[in-house]
């Protein structure tokens, strides 16, 4: 599936239906009074967060969303039918932003969350509502109220418990493949990962979502490389795993480069707890590992784990440390526990 995390779309709610001009026509009644009904309400524009979507790719091909207008009013005081709401389904983690991207208008963080974004126009008045003691046969009516319209941006921020970051070629794809069900592309060159990847990790009876984002390079905040566009996908993470390539020229400098980009990006990423992992342990001896770990501690790391995504060495202590930052139940675990609670409360089936 192609990944797209930003899309610009046009929205327009439905206009209200016009009121009717009508008069009663009955046998033996020469002058029937007005009986034109009101118009129906226009359709609303509604956003709904649904499960099973993790990209905005559908909005590349469908960019204009217009709700239907309400039906005309009719004779015999019949109000026109209201138009159905136009429901736009988006992935959980989607934000709706103003056209200039300066204001967040809606933020969808839970499955089933619905927001009525643009209200449909109210139906116009029929001539029956204009009848008065001085105007027994009014012919005026109201057109329906116009719908609302605007351009908005959709921005997807994936919901993950743990974020995985580092310079290009730090071994992030190999690592996420080793610890989760992800099937990320692996290659011996920089920028193998071009879009974020999600994987579900099961460790010691716990389950959490790990997000791998494309590698950062110096100047990413100014647009170098792939840039910092994908950093938004780890804004909601509780803890970050910072992979540092032990076979690189200067692991301490690599560590500082990534942290400088986090600080330049802002949004609180520089303050998130980090678990620093020297990756590719299988390519170095113990003395070299110890020396690089000491340099990372001096560079600001709180604790350093030596791991190998290729062989699995050292990964278990790292995942143990991750569990210490997670809540009692993560988003994936909550769904399972809710089902179990319902089963326990229900007990044996009874028709009563």
Swiss-Prot record:
Binding sites annotated in the UniProt record for Mg(2+): 173, 193
Gene3D superfamilies, alphabetized: GTP1/OBG domain (2.70.210.12), P-loop containing nucleotide triphosphate hydrolases (3.40.50.300)
InterPro entries, sorted: G_OBG, GTP-bd, GTP-bd_Obg/CgtA, GTP1-OBG_CS, GTP1_OBG_dom, GTP1_OBG_dom_sf, OBG_GTPase, P-loop_NTPase
Cellular compartment(s): Cytoplasm
EC category: hydrolase
Domain OBG-type G: 160-327
Pfam families reported in the protein's UniProt record: GTP1_OBG, MMR_HSR1
GO MF term set: GTP binding; GTPase activity; magnesium ion binding
Region named Disordered: 329-352
Membership in a protein family: Belongs to the TRAFAC class OBG-HflX-like GTPase superfamily. OBG GTPase family.
Protein name stated in the entry: GTPase Obg
């Amino acid at each position: 599936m192609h990944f797209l995390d930003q899309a610009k779309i046009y929205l327009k709610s439905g206009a209200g239906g016009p009121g009717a001009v009508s008069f009663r026509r009955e046998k033996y009644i020469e002058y029937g009074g007005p009986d034109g009904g009101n118009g129906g309400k226009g359709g609303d524009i509604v956003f709904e967060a649904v499960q099973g979507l993790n990209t905005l790719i559908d909005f590349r091909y469908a960019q204009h969303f217009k709700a239907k207008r309400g039906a005309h009013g009719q004779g015999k005081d019949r109000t026109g039918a209201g138009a159905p709401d136009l429901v736009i389904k988006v992935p959980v983690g989607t934000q709706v932003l103003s056209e200039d991207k300066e204001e967040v208008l809606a933020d969808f963080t839970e499955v089933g969350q619905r927001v009525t974004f643009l209200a449909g126009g109210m139906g116009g008045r029929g001539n029956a509502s204009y009848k008065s003691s001085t105007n027994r046969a009014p012919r005026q009516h109201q057109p329906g109220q116009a719908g609302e319209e605007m351009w908005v941006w959709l921005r997807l921020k994936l919901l993950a418990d743990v974020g995985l970051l580092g310079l290009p070629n730090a071994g992030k794809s190999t690592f996420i493949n080793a610890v989760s069900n992800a099937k990320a592309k692996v290659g011996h060159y920089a920028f193998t990962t071009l879009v974020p990847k999600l994987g579900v990790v099961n460790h010691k009876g716990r389950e959490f979502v790990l997000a791998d984002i494309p590698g950062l390079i110096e100047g990413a905040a100014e647009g170098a490389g792939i840039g910092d566009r994908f950093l938004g996908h780890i804004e909601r993470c509780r803890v970050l795993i910072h992979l540092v390539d032990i076979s690189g020229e200067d692991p301490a400098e690599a560590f500082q480069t990534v942290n400088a980009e986090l600080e330049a990006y802002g949004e609180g990423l520089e303050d998130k707890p980090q678990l620093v992992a020297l990756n590719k342990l299988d390519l170095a001896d113990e003395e070299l590992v110890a020396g690089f770990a000491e340099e990372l501690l001096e560079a600001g790391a709180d604790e350093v784990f030596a791991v190998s995504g290729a062989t699995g060495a050292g990964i278990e202590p790292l995942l143990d440390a991750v569990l210490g930052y997670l809540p009692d139940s993560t988003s994936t675990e909550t769904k399972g526990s809710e089902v179990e609670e319902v089963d326990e409360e229900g007990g044996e089936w009874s028709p009563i």
